[in-house]
Amino acid sequence: AVPLTIAQLIQLLYNVVDRIYIGHLPGTQGEALTGVGLVFPIISMIAAFTNLFSMGGAPLFSIARGEGDEKKASYILNNTFTMLVITAFVLMAVGYGWERPILYLFGASDVTYPFANDYLTIYLAGTLFLMIGTGMNSFISAEGFPKTGMLVVICGAVINIALDPLFIFVLNMGVKGAAIATVISQFVSMILVLRFFHGNKTLYRISGKYMKLKKVLGIILISSMFVFLVAGCSLVDNLKTFKENDDTADTKEQNQVIVEDD
């Protein structure tokens, strides 16, 4: 339990570290932080899809192993992998296709949109890395190697922390640099996870032999309803917050006009 808890805590560092460094950007730190903050609901949606499959698949995988049904366990692992890959490409397509309207729906303005767009455009490119690296990591722990799973997460987090200042300040890439550092760290985590499932420790390998695409697509369609409901609630909450901020700004402007008239 301890390695899993540590891994989850470290996973939270990705976005926190980005915001810490972005908060030290000279001159535009406020707008940059706001822009990156607008992307977090989208990141949460990607994480929700990842957890949907991994947290559902890993326990079923463990149950199948406990029953001694190795074939069923292999099917569960490989079908989860397939769902993660398909969903990642779908989310990338939706994100790139409706990036601008989605960000404005979440409350972007003409000032904050460029920062949000820069971060999201690069971050979406790493959706597959994130979903495989995080989603399949649950199966590493379920197979009995929680420390290995923890080390994968730690490795990704350390790389992100190390690369952030390099790309953001040294290479002067700003928000784009933060996103690039995150994507690189997620890519490394994915490679480590895939290497595990093709190494000597594991008894279960990722193989097309155990992937049933028709069943997987059916599960995706059914399970996606819940995630879209959560995403919808997040959207409504962001729109409400945006409207409240907009109303506050209008009130301040009206008060300023009254003062000037006086």
Task: Spell out what each predicted region is.
Residues 237-262:
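N-terminal, intrinsically disordered, polar/charged segments of Gram-positive cell-envelope systems
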Residues 13-16, 24, 30, 64-67, ...:
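Helix-loop interface residues and adjacent transmembrane-helix termini in multi-pass membrane transporters
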Residues 33-93, 130-149:
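Small-residue-rich hydrophobic transmembrane alpha-helices
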